Amino acid sequence: MPRPISITVDLDAIRQNFAYANALGVNALESSINDRQSNTLAVIKADAYGHGAVATARALNGQAALLAVSSIEEAVSLRQHHIKTPILLLEGCFCPSELSVVNELNLQIVIHNQKQIEDLLAQVLTKPIKVWLKVDTGMHRLGIPVSDALKAYTQLASSKNVCSVMLMTHFATSDHPDHPLLLSQIQSIQKLAEKVSAEPSYAGCSLANSAALLATPKSISTWNRPGIMLYGISPFNQSDINVLPLIPAMTFSSKVIALRRVATGESVGYGAIWTAKRPSIIATVAAGYGDGYPRTAKSGTPVMVNGQIAPLAGRVSMDMLCVDVTQLTDISEGSPVELWGKNIPVNDVAAWADTLGYELVTRMPTRAKRVFINE
C-alpha cells in the first residue's frame, strides 16, 4: 500500500478561474488606455505555480490565447509536450543564441535592458518577432528606465527583427490598491503610451497582474497577466478567498496513520514545544516538510481531519505532523486529512508559517504523487 499523501489538481477549477479573470478584463470600463480589445494571458511559470505547466496549458487550450513563462527552458518543455499556444518569455533571452530558438518555437520575448535590445538588433532572424518592452515605472527590479523608454521603443520599432512592440510594466503595490505608487506607475506608462500609440508597431499595453485585475480596473489594458488567481489563490490576505469567486485548484491531502492518547503535561514532537493542557488525542499524519508542508507552521495551524478543523500540535517533522483531534468525532487510522485546498486556503497555512501561499505551492517536491482531475 503506497504512502497516502497526494496533490490533486482540479483542472476545471483553473479553467473557471481563467474565465473569471478574462471576464474582468472584458468588462472593464475604467481604463483610459484600453483603446483596444482586452485580452488575458495565462502565467504558467514555475510549473504553473506548482500545479503542472503542461497539464495547465492543455486545460486552457482554446481559452488562453497566450501563455507566459520565465525562461526558454520552460517554453521548450511545453513545445516538447506539443503545446502549440503562443508563449511569452517574461525575462526575455539570457544570451543571443536563444533568439534563434525564439524564432523556431514561435515565442514572444520581453526586453528589459539595453543589452537585450542590442543583441536582438544584431541578429539575423528568419522572421520578425513580437516584443514586449518592459518599462521600470517604480518596481526597480527589471525594466528600461522611464527616461530611456521612448528611445528604446524607437530602436525596437525601427528594426526588421521586430514586428510589434507591446509596452508593459510590473506593479510593486498592486495588492494595496490605494498605495500612491500604484497610481504613479499607471500614469507613467500611460504617458509613454500616448507618445507611441500612433506608431504602426504599437501593439498596446500590459499592466495588470492578478491583484490589479481584481482591485484596480483602471490598470486593465490590452493584455492582462493573471498568475496566482488562476490557481484559486488570493493575491491579497488569507481571508479574501472567502469573498472572491476563485476556486482553489490544488488539494494537498493525506491520512491519519496513528492515534495516541497524551496525558496532561506530556509533550508532542521535536523540541517538546507543544504540551497537553488536558488529556488529549493526537493524530499523526503522513505529511511533513519533505512533502512540502512548511516546517515553520506553528501549533494551531488549521488542518481538516475527516471534514473537521483541528489544530496542528508541535513541530512539523520531515515525514509527519501531529494534530490535536481531542475535540473531533469519528477519527480513526485512515481518516482523510486536507492540509490545504478547497476547505483550508493555502494562504491560511502560509500565514501560520510566516510566508506566502505563492511560496508553498511553488516549492512542492515530487515526492507526493500528483493527480489531475477534470482534464
From Swiss-Prot:
Pfam families: Ala_racemase_C, Ala_racemase_N. The active site is at K45, Y270. Gene3D superfamilies: Alanine racemase, Lyase, Ornithine Decarboxylase, Chain A, domain 1. GO terms for molecular function: alanine racemase activity; pyridoxal phosphate binding. Its EC number is 5.1.1.1. The modification N6-(pyridoxal phosphate)lysine is found at K45. Signal peptide: none annotated. Pathway: Amino-acid biosynthesis; D-alanine biosynthesis; D-alanine from L-alanine: step 1/1. Substrate binds at R141, M318. One of its GO terms (biological process) is D-alanine biosynthetic process. Its cofactor is pyridoxal 5'-phosphate. It catalyses: L-alanine = D-alanine. Keywords: Isomerase, Pyridoxal phosphate. InterPro entries: Ala_racemase, Ala_racemase/Decarboxylase_C, Ala_racemase_C, Ala_racemase_N, Ala_racemase_pyridoxalP-BS, PLP-binding_barrel. One of its GO terms (cellular component) is cytosol. Belongs to the alanine racemase family. Catalyzes the interconversion of L-alanine and D-alanine. May also act on other amino acids. This is Alanine racemase.
